């Protein structure tokens, strides 16, 4: 009997890519597969997304994994390179890089490369995390233009801080700032990530960068992926390893924090915080088993979770429960725990088996 297993539906993944293309029909798609494709498996996900135009990752090791796995499409390093030595690796492996600070610019000017590298200049239009400040952007761009180690044309990218249709002022200002800077400059432009792809068509430029939406997950609170025509890609399952009679007044788990008010049956699932399921999940967090929702009770342990199956339960050892997936949205589970969906899906550990279906 397998323990915790993440079932990844590649057909749903490809559906989501097609749906995203419908939201941005004039843009190329840069599939964001950082953090092990948000916990879904970096290389297999990239291989399944054959219709993506580009891929992007956060770290150079992720990019090299894609190249060694046979991915030949352009790959962008979203945080850029971290050291001078990285530049030769990028050049040899034809990996494109974001440039967002003067230290990277100086490194590009100093290094000797047999061929130039492709860069995306990141400008800070309001996120205030990475990017060249607007008042420094013209001079920065000109130095890139003059640098023989930089392939031309230079592409330009930014990131929106808060896609909120009810308060669009900040987003609109960021878009205006971006458009003012890129006016008349050649090369590809990119603003929109998942949220802006779905709700902000005025931000769609040459390239859009779907991340969380690719995996069927809403980037917005109080909504699920299906609200936007997206399908969940991951279903996290685990088997019942015990079904126990439980008397009224008995506790369960560490510190006995939960006390049964009535006689019931408790089930024990083979999953815990050692698998990446949050220890902070409170009593009442939902689990799906045998066509119904049941609550977690007591503390999440390293390897196990207890659930209240009810006094009339007929569940058996070996029955599989869904922690999130088709029957129970990840967004709903995240809201119970107080996590974002981004955190929850990317926290799974290597102990969770991954199974791919088409």
Swiss-Prot record:
GO terms for cellular component: cytosol. Pfam families: Ala_racemase_C, Ala_racemase_N. The modification N6-(pyridoxal phosphate)lysine is found at residue 34. It catalyses: L-alanine = D-alanine. Its cofactor is pyridoxal 5'-phosphate. Its EC number is 5.1.1.1. Keywords: Isomerase, Pyridoxal phosphate. InterPro entries: Ala_racemase, Ala_racemase/Decarboxylase_C, Ala_racemase_C, Ala_racemase_N, Ala_racemase_pyridoxalP-BS, PLP-binding_barrel. GO terms for biological process: D-alanine biosynthetic process. Substrate binds at residues 129, 302. The keyword Isomerase applies. One of its GO terms (molecular function) is alanine racemase activity. Catalyzes the interconversion of L-alanine and D-alanine. May also act on other amino acids. PANTHER family: ALANINE RACEMASE (PTHR30511), ALANINE RACEMASE, BIOSYNTHETIC (PTHR30511:SF4). Belongs to the alanine racemase family. This is Alanine racemase. The gene is alr.
């Amino acid at each position: 009997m397998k323990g915790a297993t993440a079932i990844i539906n590649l057909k749903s993944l490809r559906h989501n890519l097609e749906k995203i293309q419908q939201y941005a029909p004039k843009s190329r798609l840069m599939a964001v597969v950082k953090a092990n494709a948000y916990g879904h498996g970096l290389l297999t996900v990239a291989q399944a997304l054959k219709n993506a135009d580009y891929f992007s990752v956060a770290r150079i090791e992720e990019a090299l994994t894609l190249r060694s796995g046979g991915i030949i499409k352009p790959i962008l390093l979203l945080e850029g390179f971290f050291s001078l030595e990285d530049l030769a690796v990028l050049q040899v492996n034809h990996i494109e890089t974001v440039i967002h600070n003067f230290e990277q610019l100086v490194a590009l000017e100093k290094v000797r490369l047999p061929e130039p590298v492709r860069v995306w200049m990141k400008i800070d239009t309001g996120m205030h995390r990475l990017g060249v400040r607007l008042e420094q952007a013209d001079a920065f761009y000109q130095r890139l233009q003059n640098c023989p180690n930089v392939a031309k044309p230079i592409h330009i990218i930014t990131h929106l801080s808060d896609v909120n249709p009810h308060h669009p002022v900040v987003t609109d200002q960021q878009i205006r700032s971006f458009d003012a800077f890129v006016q008349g400059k050649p090369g590809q432009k990119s603003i929109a990530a998942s949220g802006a792809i779905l709700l902000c068509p005025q931000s769609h430029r040459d390239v859009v960068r779907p991340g969380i939406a690719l995996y069927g997950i809403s980037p917005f609170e109080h909504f699920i992926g299906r609200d936007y025509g997206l399908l969940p890609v991951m279903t996290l399952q685990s088997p019942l390893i015990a079904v126990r009679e439980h008397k009224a007044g008995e506790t369960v788990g560490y510190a006995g924090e939960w006390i049964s008010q009535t006689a019931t049956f408790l089930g024990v699932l083979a999953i815990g915080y050692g698998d990446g399921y949050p220890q902070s999940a409170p009593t009442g967090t939902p689990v799906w088993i045998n066509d119904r929702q049941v609550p977690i009770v007591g503390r999440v342990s390293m390897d196990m979770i207890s659930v209240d199956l009810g006094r009339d339960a007929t569940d058996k050892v070996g029955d599989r429960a869904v922690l999130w997936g088709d029957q129970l949205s990840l967004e709903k589970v995240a809201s119970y725990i107080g996590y974002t969906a981004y955190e929850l899906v990317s926290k799974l550990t290597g102990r969770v088996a991954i199974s791919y279906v088409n």
